[in-house]
Amino acid sequence: MIFWLILCISTTFSGEITISIKKSTGKTCTVKENKVILQQQIPPRFPFEQRTRAELRFYRDMDYTKNALDYTQILTQLKARGLLFKDEERAVEVLANISYFRIANYLRYFEIDNDRHLYKPDTYFEDAVYIYYFDKKLRGLLFTAIQSIEVSLRSKVIHHVALSHGPFWFADYNLCINRAMYADNLTTIKREVQRSKEDFIQEHFRKYSYPDVPPVWKTLEVTSFGTLSKLFCNLNDNRVKKQIARLYNLPQHQVLESWIKCIVILRNCLAHHARVWNRRFPQMPQLSIRARGNWIDSTHVRPNKLYAQICCLAYLLDSIYPQNDFKVQVKNLLNEYPDINIHYMGFPNDWENQPLWM
């Protein structure tokens, strides 16, 4: 077999050589005393940080030498990079209450040089603040929707799986697909239960000594959404999983699994107040489905963008609460912020004409 490698070599002050292997793994390794030590994989950059220089570059060990700046110094630095301000006093208030680095996540959208952080002509600090407040309201809207879906899914998983496999099915390795994941899940469940301060958990342990975890209807009320997702996906009873999926008007449990995995990642972003409006998500929902309810034409939908996940949330909410106003709230928010470029969120041109949104 013929293959090729391109190596980037740089030296450190200690004489070590860092080699970046271009083709094979995308990982770096260090050559020291004729021994090659593999280091961690270089993480991918956010979409708005795509480099304009050649992809092949030198990686060096560097010391971080930047000092903290006061608000006036931050404004001076941003001005030197080409950023404009409509109200500098208000800008200082924003930095004091939101922090520069959080706003910088939105300023990067306006950069023309990601290495030197130079901004497009006629870019104002307030432009980034505008997107920040839109993103903040959007996060609140999505988080509320996910709460309803999470509570519903917990209830259905607890009820239907327990009826088929008993109150401690999550501790039965015969019901899992992957034994290693089963062990990890059980360890996580026990840890989450032990640290819970809920009265019903404390009361359970005062009354019962065996098994060492409460039944599923208590346990799954104090475990994380991520743990719930892993338990459901690792369950080997496809009949029960399909039964639950059909309660959400989904034809296959694999579709529900793919949606839940995406929603867990989205929820974590929301819980940590992370930017979501133009994020590319690593987990993508299955969109080409034979839906029983009103759905979308997914032909031109980018599954790694937020619009795809918003559609999944809307569809699930319609099955849980048919009279919900989630879609109305989404439209109202977009109307409130007309200058937001919704294409960066993955919205297609005809999204409002899709059956789901009509």
Residue ranges and their predicted role:
Residues 8-11, 16:
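Cationic, amphipathic, low-complexity segments that mediate targeting or membrane/lipid association
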Residues 12, 27-265, 277-358:
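Extended intrinsically disordered or low-complexity regions, especially N/C-terminal cytosolic tails and loops
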Residues 20-26:
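Compositionally biased, low-complexity peptide segments typical
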Residues 273:
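Acidic/aromatic/glycine-rich contiguous surface patches that form carbohydrate-binding/processing clefts
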